[in-house]
A protein has these predicted regions:
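N-terminal capping/small domains of soluble enzymes
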Residues: 1-103, 125-127
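Non-globular sequence segments
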Residues: 89-92, 97, 103-138
Length: 138
């Protein structure tokens, strides 16, 4: 606890304290994972005042076939570039740094969510799953 409010420096990053906001699945993205005003408002509120040194932006899918939920944010293509720039700008303006958590849900998703056949490391149903995924070979 003694170091919580002390600066943390790495070779390429300086944090004004050691407070980190973890990624939260807000489910606030628009159709297709598009970044909307709800996400901008949410992170504006969380980063306001710069008290949190580092904000980890919620898990965002890297491929449509790996989408975890309907409201998940997308980084699967360039459609969100302008919105992501605006999001980073808001967080930085408020005095925090930003990093994004990216993911592929694999067998933890469903074809209902992705609109595609689900894939995974093996043909074993995920504990929370409803479908047996197609095993990836390469």
């Amino acid at each position: 606890m003694a170091n919580l409010l002390q600066t943390l420096e790495t070779e390429k990053l300086v944090l004004n304290n050691r407070l980190v906001f973890p990624p939260m699945a807000t489910e606030k993205s628009n159709e297709g994972g598009k970044l909307g005003q709800g996400i901008l408002d949410y992170y504006n509120e969380k980063s306001m005042g710069g008290y949190i040194s580092l904000i980890i932006i919620e898990h965002s899918f890297v491929n449509e076939k790996g989408r975890a939920s309907k409201g998940q944010l997308s980084v699967a293509d360039d459609r969100n570039n302008e919105g992501l720039k605006e999001l980073a700008s808001i967080i930085h303006k408020n005095g925090s740094k930003a990093v994004m958590q990216i993911n592929h849900a694999g067998s933890a998703t469903t074809s209902e969510i992705t609109g595609n056949e689900i894939v995974g490391p093996s043909q074993v149903m995920h504990l929370r799953g409803k479908e047996i995924p197609r095993e990836l070979t390469k």
